């Protein structure tokens, strides 16, 4: 995997699930493949957009449904936010320093509440900093209905989550 870098632990593995659509399958798999094997040195910042690159036909992406300012539309790379959300959650539970993410403009029930993320080339990104003191390795895998992001390195913290009940937000 990343021999010689001192990578010895699975820091975290996170999986999200999605309903089948051909475009979604292609774009999610393409994004995961571009990101797979990324090594982030201590102090470096991982950027989803840098790892995955621009979503173009030449890079293997196809048109699909995406959300743009709260409206569904068809564009290249539709569905890649699934990988962004999975990556954000892996970073969240790894204890790495969270740098940048942007939630969708409305809640999507298949994503973890409060921990979903969208991306758009080149500025809307998912970023985290390797503050572990050791190199980390980003590994991806996928099926027809799920995508998994695992982060390997040297475990340095333990992260726990607690879910509070949903409440209505009232603006004053």
Report the location of each language-model feature:
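Well-ordered beta-sheet/strand-loop patches within structured domains
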Residues: 1-172
């Amino acid at each position: 995997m990343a021999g010689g870098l001192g990578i010895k632990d699975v820091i975290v593995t996170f999986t999200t699930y999605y309903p089948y659509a051909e475009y979604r399958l292609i774009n999610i798999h393409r994004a995961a493949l571009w990101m797979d094997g990324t090594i982030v040195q201590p102090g470096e910042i991982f950027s989803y957009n840098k790892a995955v690159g621009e979503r173009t036909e030449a890079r293997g992406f196809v048109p699909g449904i995406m959300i743009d300012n709260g409206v569904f539309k068809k564009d290249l790379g539709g569905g890649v936010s699934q990988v962004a959300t999975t990556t954000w959650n892996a970073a969240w539970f790894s204890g790495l320093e969270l740098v940048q993410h942007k939630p969708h403009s409305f809640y999507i029930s298949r994503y973890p509440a409060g921990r979903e993320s969208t991306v758009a080339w080149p500025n809307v990104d998912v970023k985290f900093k390797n503050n572990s003191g050791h190199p980390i390795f980003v590994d991806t895998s996928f099926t027809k209905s799920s995508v998994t992001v695992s982060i390997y390195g040297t475990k340095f913290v333990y992260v726990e989550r607690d879910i509070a009940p949903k409440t209505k937000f009232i603006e004053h």
